[in-house]
């Protein structure tokens, strides 16, 4: 019988994802902290934090798992036209802090708001370790969309996105897929499957299959310049 594990502030190993609860789906552990080493240990094992403000830290590994193969995003003709018409600019790791802060702001008041100040500080620390990264969308000098996530070997674990203009977050996803494909990434972890992700081309993998792919790709290094702060051009 699966049971919930309780973590202390020592950097102990996580329990295996196979022991996660089925209800709620994927809840594996509670407690601990968001120290960069613990966070990286979590992603390395296919586990991520997700909890509401004023709640204890909750650690998840749902079954099934939503994933993309880089390049598999369904980009509609209307989105392609929109990107070309608006002449947006794109960048990598030029404004990570602003991206995560915008993600937090645009979620305020929504059910499931989880990008707390504690979460923001934790992922900003990961960014300093060159493990958390962002894609930015600009209209002139104004940041109008973006996303962020964590890179583990050839796997990119998406966390959240935002838009201040219509389609800007989808444009960020399209840029992410192109960037990951060009740097030989093999898998994008989109965490929890939903109809929106399915409409964009995400597939639902059994957790065991996802973990096997993660183990296959997580120790393979990518080019050192993949996440240097840079302007990038989208190809449609």
Curated annotation (Swiss-Prot):
**Record's InterPro entries?**
Acyl_CoA_acyltransferase, Leu/Phe-tRNA_Trfase, Leu/Phe-tRNA_Trfase_C, Leu/Phe-tRNA_Trfase_N
What Gene Ontology cellular-component terms does the record carry?
Answer: cytoplasm
Listed under catalytic activity are: N-terminal L-lysyl-[protein] + L-leucyl-tRNA(Leu) = N-terminal L-leucyl-L-lysyl-[protein] + tRNA(Leu) + H(+); N-terminal L-arginyl-[protein] + L-leucyl-tRNA(Leu) = N-terminal L-leucyl-L-arginyl-[protein] + tRNA(Leu) + H(+); L-phenylalanyl-tRNA(Phe) + an N-terminal L-alpha-aminoacyl-[protein] = an N-terminal L-phenylalanyl-L-alpha-aminoacyl-[protein] + tRNA(Phe)
Main localisation? cytoplasm
Q: Where in the cell is it found?
A: Cytoplasm
Q: Which PANTHER family match?
A: LEUCYL/PHENYLALANYL-TRNA--PROTEIN TRANSFERASE, LEUCYL_PHENYLALANYL-TRNA--PROTEIN TRANSFERASE
Name the job this protein performs. Answer: Functions in the N-end rule pathway of protein degradation where it conjugates Leu, Phe and, less efficiently, Met from aminoacyl-tRNAs to the N-termini of proteins containing an N-terminal arginine or lysine.
Record-linked NCBIfam families: aat (TIGR00667)
Q: What is this protein called?
A: Leucyl/phenylalanyl-tRNA--protein transferase
Q: Which source organism does the UniProt entry give?
A: Shewanella loihica (strain ATCC BAA-1088 / PV-4)
